[in-house]
Amino acid sequence: MTVLDIVTYPADVLKDGALPVANIDGKLQQLIDDMAQTMYAHQGVGLAAVQVDSGLRLVIYDVSDQREKQQFRVVINPEVVAVDGECVSEQEGCLSVPELRTDVKRAATVRVEGVDREGRPLVIDAEGLEAIVLQHEIDHLNGTLILDRASRLKRELYKRKVQKRIKQAWQET
């Protein structure tokens, strides 16, 4: 397994959205395993394929209390098909938007449908942290970042900070 590079804002791939997975083959299985290795190496709780520069509708996550067992879940072609309950607002961070933590409103309960890594239909009724993580990762597949859900002020301050870093890096080369 390989730890993959995490794509960070403002990379275009993060805004492009993802295409459905057509074939579950050895190449996809390797991507899943590499994504898991990457997620754990970066202490993440979830990872979307677009975050490792793959334009596929694929997410992995692990919200278990025993993360050392690395019992991550895989959802291929995930779709939120139902939301229920009130909205909750939680502080979220993102590996692709480093150094930003912001309150994001999410549905408290969601139903997600997709397929597992063997291609079997999957229905997940999630609440709490699992619901938040699934919505966050599916947002990635739709080209939405937590930055897009942040307040306008926070969004503008973060964008300026990133542009300043890019300009400094450009000048150093």
UniProtKB/Swiss-Prot annotation:
Cofactor binding, note field: Binds 1 Fe(2+) ion.
Active site: E137
A Pfam family that the UniProt record links to this protein: Pep_deformylase
Binding site for Fe cation: C94, H136, H140
Key words, A-Z: Hydrolase, Iron, Metal-binding, Protein biosynthesis
Stored InterPro entries: Peptide_deformylase, Peptide_deformylase_sf
Entry's EC annotation: 3.5.1.88
HAMAP family referenced in this protein's UniProt entry, alphabetically: Pep_deformylase
PANTHER family, sorted: PEPTIDE DEFORMYLASE
Function as written in the Swiss-Prot or TrEMBL entry: Removes the formyl group from the N-terminal Met of newly synthesized proteins. Requires at least a dipeptide for an efficient rate of reaction. N-terminal L-methionine is a prerequisite for activity but the enzyme has broad specificity at other positions.
Protein name per the record: Peptide deformylase
Species of provenance: Desulfosudis oleivorans (strain DSM 6200 / JCM 39069 / Hxd3)
Encoding gene per record: def
